[in-house]
Amino acid sequence: MAEKHGNLSINSDNLFPIINKWLYSDHDIFYRELISNGCDAITKLKKLDMMGEYELPADYKPQIQVIVNPDEKTLKFIDNGLGMTADEVEEYINQIAFSGATDFIEKYKDKANDDQIIGHFGLGFYSAFMVADQVTIDTLSYKKNATPVHWACDGGTEFDMTDGTKEGVGTEITLYLNEDCLEFANEYRAREVIEKYCSFMPTPIFLSKANAETEYETIDAADKLDTDTVVEEIHEEAKTEEKENENGEKEVVEVSPAKEKLKIVKRPVPLNDTNPLWAKNPKDCTDEEYKEFYRKVFLDYKEPLFWIHLNMDYPFNLKGILYFPKINTEYDSIEGTIKLYNNQVFIADNIKEVIPEFLMLLKGVIDCPDLPLNVSRSALQNDGFVKKISEYITKKVADKLIGMCKTEKESYEKYWDDISPFIKFGCLKDTKFCDKMNDYILFKNLDDKYLTLPELLVKEEEKKDDAEVLDKDGNPIANTGDAAASDNTADGSDTSADSEKDERKVIYYVTDKVQQGQYIKLFKEQNMQAVILDHNIDTSFITQLEQRNEKYKFMRIDADVTESLKDETSAEDLKAETDALTEVFKKALNNDKLTVKVEKLKNENISSIITLSEEGRRMQDMMKMYAMNGMGGMDMNMFAADQTLTLNANNELVKYIFEHKDSENVPMFCEQLYDLAVLSNHPLSVDEMTKFVERSNKIMMLLAK
């Protein structure tokens, strides 16, 4: 071939600065592009062999070599794929590659950074000019009697193409790195980038350093391969020891036989796994393989709870593995990572257009060869095909969870505390997921038993008829069913006058078993139940459940004093106590807005209870959540929940205050009763606690006199 000097049909003053601007944050991506090109060339050559258009050598081993040379500031990418002729270099490098790069830049040069190309695919070979002042290609086509070609370009508008000297079929690309990118000639940096993008590419990738000292290893002679370079044969003598036999006589015993070993040049080890676990049939994978893959990919040495192996060929090709990690705190789940691959080539983490947002809480890999990559994120958002992928993934996750609940209930319950934030978040974010999961969400009750929502409602309905109710002395009394018949709660208890307006079943819940211990004790004495909802997400979750289903509502255990906790007494019977005690407590506490109720509770040991309206508390909780997420700025007191102080007319101390309301110590007793009630509901402030301790000391001094 005659030497050719030509001009590229593009203004490089426009192209390369834009490439650098576009890909600056991911300027290591050229590794992936060049190695991917090598993989494609090898795949095509193997297909030609399968079709009978080319015969591969018997000892052919597909591979890609990456050679770093820090001394010469170069980086080589060598593949033994199908190579190129001069005409193909002209077509694929001088015309198509540059043309494709030009179209790419022209289409997306005005896009904002948050609308970038998915994975930056499309630039291919010319991504090399992000880091190199000059790039050369040496290639030899598989075609019979092909002539090797040498091509060179310094990133300007000109290139040189001549006959080359390459002897083996394939392509060698050499990058002469610019001064700002010499890090990529470092062996450890190269390894890091290759493992980032190419850990699972389908062709073995080998990394080496030019002019490095030869490394050796020793193997058993029986393990020698034809490709091994033997440096030395080693004979190890048998090892013997002197031992006493059964007769007490000493004799020489062989403890290790003689061995023949070989010192060989260290065998190269590929950096990648060419057959990743997700590409295998799930039936052929063991639990240990799944766990090992998880540790390797996510560097997490805590075992995952369980996993879902996705394997679909129609109507689109998608494979992957999603892991449910073990969560140590309620915040751990936000650290999930879903890695997206295209034909085993890493694209990016957490592509929200493809992967449902709530799945980002998991860890996993998804490989979808059919995914369109040379489009912007905004295009993906509106792509019906991508939406189907997202819906399929969501469906498979729901199917797995439902299947576990039905057939592996014990395991499902064991995992529930870890996976419940994920499932609840998914229900909040995805209506279809919520519809499927609605009857398989578990609630843990005060006895640490897990029940689905339908089971919970049925169980509590049954308790209305069977409950053993206790009187104020703790003795069982007959349950005629009349009280239950008047109840509208899932626990067999009327909530308040509101129950006349709202016929929903009430599900009581607890957010802190320690803080709300007094209320729990009252419930258990009357054989009532509540569920535990102690995660930040639960307020939003139960609100959504109520909006979707009018059959039930949730109420925190301290939101009201239910009828089942009271003796049967009319409000008229307690009018005198209510009027007097309301006046005394409002005056003692200097709080005219305080709502005071007087009830006869069955447990006479409890003097007072603070209740907060459910609606007000939920608003408070939501405002706290906004503040935690940096969305504060509003006065939290604006959303203070309405408090009600309920005094127990059966309690001796309350009786004393009523009978001695003019006593000089009564205001102090009122303050103490109020603080005791508050303590059972939420912690006191520093100032409130200081006053509480001082007051307690005064009361003890009175008792000591």
Write out the residue ranges for each language-model feature:
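GHKL (Bergerat-fold) ATPase N-terminal catalytic module, capturing the glycine-rich phosphate-binding loop
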Residues: 1-185, 192, 199, 215-217, ...
